[in-house]
Each structure stands twice: as C-alpha cells, then as structure tokens.
C-alpha cells in the first residue's frame, strides 16, 4: 500500500531523465544531494521537532501550514542549492538541476511526513498528495528553466514572462489550496478530478519547447 508513495519520485526521476538528452547519470549527484539534505532535515524534525499538525476547521490556517511546510520551505531550499551548485558556463538554465534536487528531497521528505502522521493514513495522503507534489515540482522546474534560460532570458517578450510567472504562481499555490480544501471536507470526487487536472497541467508544461 505504501509502495506508490515511496517509489513515485525515484521512478518519476528516471522517466524524466530518459527524456533528457544528457540522461540520468549527469543529474544523479543532484538527486543524492537532495536526498542528503532531506535526510538531515527529517532527522532534525524527528529528534527536535516531533510535531504533528492537526487539521483545523479554518481553510486559511490549513493552507498556510501546508504551503509553508510542503511548498515554500522545501522549494526555497532547493532553489538556493541550484544557484550554489550551478557553476558551469555551458549550462542552459540556472534551474536545470531543480527537478532532480526536488525529486531527491521529496522522495525522503514526503514519505517521512506522511508515514509519521495520523493512522489510518487517508487515501488522499497515500495517493493524491504524492501525485500533486510530483506534479508541482515537474511544472515548477519546467517553468523556472524556461524563465531563466540563459540563451533567451533577455529576448523573451513580456507577455510570455507574465504568462510563465502566473503559471508558476498557480503551480505553487494550487497544491496547498487543494489539500486545505480536502481537510475541511471537500467532495472526494471533486478532489480526485482536480488532482488529475493538475497532473495534466504539469504534464502539459513538461513538454513545452519540445
């Protein structure tokens, strides 16, 4: 039952890497760095911050917690790592390592947070949330790569920059919106439909410029 949760990000990375001209080997150091950072972070939380969040009746409180814990803090850390490790002059974007870093991080972080939470574990957390988080890093990485592509950043027209910026905001905000709505009793069928729609959105952005 837990295999999907534990294997989605590793398998997703290798599928992503096969579509990349450089293959998986070039990005494995970034994956392992993401895994290492995640393991250190999870160990710190386990020993020093053994805190489990109890869903609130307030949509906005739930949204704020989910966004900070699962989106803002992890992705900010991975973005900083991107800028620290991206030194090669021939790299096509400042964020080309963003997806492998995030895949490594969430491969440890998400199972750790979910499996150390409440029991029994709801279907949403075991299946929908991993899909949502994977879709988020897939879409966000592709959009960031396009926004910060070194070859064309200076010639990209403003309308495309605005479109990509809005798409990035949506990609980052929607996961917390959907989970917060689920916490306050959103319709299960609607939740599944929106999860699949978000996956389709991410898949669409994963093939931009191809």
Predicted regions, residues:
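Hydrophobic alpha-helical segments at protein termini of multi-pass membrane proteins
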Residues: 1-210
């Amino acid at each position: 039952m837990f295999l999907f949760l534990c294997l989605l990000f590793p398998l997703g990375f290798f599928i992503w890497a096969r579509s990349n001209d450089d293959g998986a080997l070039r990005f494995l150091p970034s994956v392992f760095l993401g895994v290492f950072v995640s393991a250190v972070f999870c160990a710190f939380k386990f020993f020093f911050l053994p805190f489990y969040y109890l869903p609130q009746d307030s949509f906005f409180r739930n949204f704020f917690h989910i966004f900070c814990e699962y989106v803002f803090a992890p992705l900010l850390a991975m973005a900083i790592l991107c800028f620290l490790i991206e030194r090669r002059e021939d790299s096509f974007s400042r964020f080309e390592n963003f997806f492998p870093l995030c895949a490594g991080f969430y491969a440890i972080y998400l199972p750790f947070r979910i499996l150390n939470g409440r029991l029994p574990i709801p279907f949403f957390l075991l299946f929908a949330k991993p899909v949502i988080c994977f879709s988020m890093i897939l879409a966000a990485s592709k959009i960031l790569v396009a926004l910060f592509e070194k070859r064309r950043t200076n010639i990209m027209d403003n309308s495309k920059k605005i479109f990509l910026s809005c798409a990035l905001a949506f990609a980052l905000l929607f996961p917390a919106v959907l989970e917060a709505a689920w916490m306050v009793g959103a319709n299960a069928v609607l939740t599944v439909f929106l999860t699949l729609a978000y996956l389709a959105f991410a898949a669409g952005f994963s093939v931009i410029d191809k």
